[in-house]
Amino acid sequence: MTLESMMACCLSDEVKESKRINAEIEKQLRRDKRDARRELKLLLLGTGESGKSTFIKQMRIIHGAGYSEEDKRGFTKLVYQNIFTAMQAMIRAMETLKILYKYEQNKANALLIREVDVEKVTTFEHRYVSAIKTLWNDPGIQECYDRRREYQLSDSAKYYLTDVDRIATSGYLPTQQDVLRVRVPTTGIIEYPFDLENIIFRMVDVGGQRSERRKWIHCFENVTSIMFLVALSEYDQVLVESDNENRMEESKALFRTIVTYPWFQNSSVILFLNKKDLLEDKILFSHLVDYFPEFDGPQRVAQAAREFILKMFVDLNPDSDKIIYSHFTCATDTENIRFVFAAVKDTILQLNLKEYNLV
């Protein structure tokens, strides 16, 4: 065999090997692209306390590993802290609103609770349990609770305070509902990926308070769906950050910004009108028309109120071709969220069938 033919032979082997490697790389790239496309990014947006973190907890319960005993134990301290935070907020509001305690001993109880550094709370000592129970049963505090729209109080306050005896028992382990109700403001970005039908749903929760929103910007790439939460019960409340601004107006302004962002032109928008249970309670004594004069429906009818609120948000969408998918929700109700998210999942998959090679 001549030198030339040997070189040609070697060269053709090299070419073959090179082609094989190239083909392998191309195949891997196609696989990577396909796999990347099998991940759906869902961005959870909404103002502070609209229920985003609770929604993520529900995804963990419904589609993830849930909460083990050990996980639940990790929430014990937070439940105690939520109770102290709620009672301290009411004690401060008693002064601001000039409401008197009916029982004289509650002045001393209020002083005792006020001086607790909530962030250092890790146990629930008997003297504090007793003081909190006595305070909660005071008609003055009950009047203060009824006027909670005039100050900032967590939605979970009543849930925990009516159950102090159970929470104060030794060996207390938070229930799933206790975990869902714990309020910890979200700072930074929380991602929760879960696998459904061989597709990864990556849910991203960003803090809703104003100071947190500037951190959102880099979450905006490749978003499949925006899931925007509105607290229906906030129509008569003011912002944590600014006590002369209506919370629902703030939520509307944020939604308007989101639906007009060029980033989201190709993202579907799903609107969760959350806290429908709180709206049903509140609408009986706090009239929507007092805060939104354009409401001309019947008073004390939750259905009329929520339909009006839905229309207010849908009307902010400038693109008549873009459908806003909406659901009324109660984020602390696991069965409600299971049902709603099944519908949402079907919507998202239908909208992305071709894009994600799902057909």
UniProtKB/Swiss-Prot annotation:
Residues 178-186 are annotated as: G2 motif. Residues 329-334 are annotated as: G5 motif. Residues 41-54 are annotated as: G1 motif. The keyword Chaperone does not apply. Mg(2+) binds at S53, T186. CDD domains: G-alpha. GO terms for cellular component: cytoplasm; heterotrimeric G-protein complex; membrane; photoreceptor outer segment; synapse. A lipid is attached at C9, C10 (S-palmitoyl cysteine). Residues 270-277 are annotated as: G4 motif. Guanine nucleotide-binding proteins (G proteins) function as transducers downstream of G protein-coupled receptors (GPCRs) in numerous signaling cascades. The alpha chain contains the guanine nucleotide binding site and alternates between an active, GTP-bound state and an inactive, GDP-bound state. Signaling by an activated GPCR promotes GDP release and GTP binding. The alpha subunit has a low GTPase activity that converts bound GTP to GDP, thereby terminating the signal. Both GDP release and GTP hydrolysis are modulated by numerous regulatory proteins. This is Guanine nucleotide-binding protein subunit alpha-11.
